[in-house]
Regions:
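Amide-donor transfer/coupling interface in amidating biosynthetic enzymes
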Residues: 1-27, 43, 48, 52, ...
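Extended catalytic core of nucleotide-activated donor transferases of GT-like folds
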Residues: 42-49, 66-72
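Cysteine-nucleophile active-site neighborhood
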Residues: 58-127
Length: 220
């Protein structure tokens, strides 16, 4: 529900009138969201597969060290991602969704990081003239919370993909297709002020040792 609320808050900043629908997997039932909430507000893919949408957000999941094919609902996610190519004008792949999308559509493998990239980082814009960055400076700040990465060279090797922004550590932050119908975003512009602190507490309770305190003073 937290991610749902954060994304709705971001979408509400647009002057456009947006009608939002929520989608859940049928092959896996979430253990972190109240079942009654899902039943009341969420659809399954079979319920919406004949509709067409202007946009879709495929969100993240705490699956950093799990290979894509070992994700319990991977087959269903693949079916949905394939469907987006004909039924959604623009698809926004966020965090784990970005790595899932890059792997499914372009065969780009996600890599495990020895230490979680966790905190607020500076980003270099590679495509300054893009409408995506209208009003931005050459660098911008955004949170990251992930132990997964891709080789930037693997993304750059795909003719249909453009690297739009990278982190101060040289990691992919934003990429898109040349027709702007697919976006792949590894940072979290939707996060609230306390989200990183809450995620740190969650990771500590899990006994994770590869997580340091979140970075709050970017190096650039």
């Amino acid at each position: 529900i937290v991610t749902e609320t954060q994304l709705l808050r971001m979408l509400s900043n647009t002057p456009l009138q947006i009608q939002v629908e929520f989608l859940q997997t049928a092959s896996y039932k979430s253990t972190h969201t109240d079942a009654n909430h899902l039943k009341q507000f969420y659809h399954t893919f079979d319920q919406i597969k004949d509709r067409r949408y202007d946009g879709m957000i495929i969100t993240g999941a705490p699956l950093d060290y799990v290979p894509c094919e070992e994700t319990l609902y991977w087959d269903e996610v693949c079916k949905i991602m394939e469907w987006t190519k004909t039924h959604v004008h623009c698809t926004f792949h966020l965090c784990w969704g970005a790595y899932a999308g890059l792997y499914y559509h372009y065969g780009i493998e996600k890599l495990d990081m020895p230490k979680k990239l966790f905190g607020i980082y500076s980003h270099e814009i590679r495509k300054e003239t893009s409408p995506l960055f209208r009003g931005f400076n050459d660098h911008f700040l955004a949170p990251h919370s992930r132990a997964t990465d891709v080789r930037l060279s693997d993304v750059e090797a795909i003719p249909n993909l453009e690297v739009m922004a990278v982190t101060e550590t040289g990691s992919l932050a934003i990429a898109k297709t040349r027709d702007s119908r697919q976006f792949f975003v590894t940072c979290h512009a939707e996060y609230d002020r306390e989200t990183l602190a809450l995620e740190y507490e969650r990771d500590m309770k899990k006994g994770l040792t590869s997580v340091d305190l979140p970075v709050t003073e970017p190096s650039s």
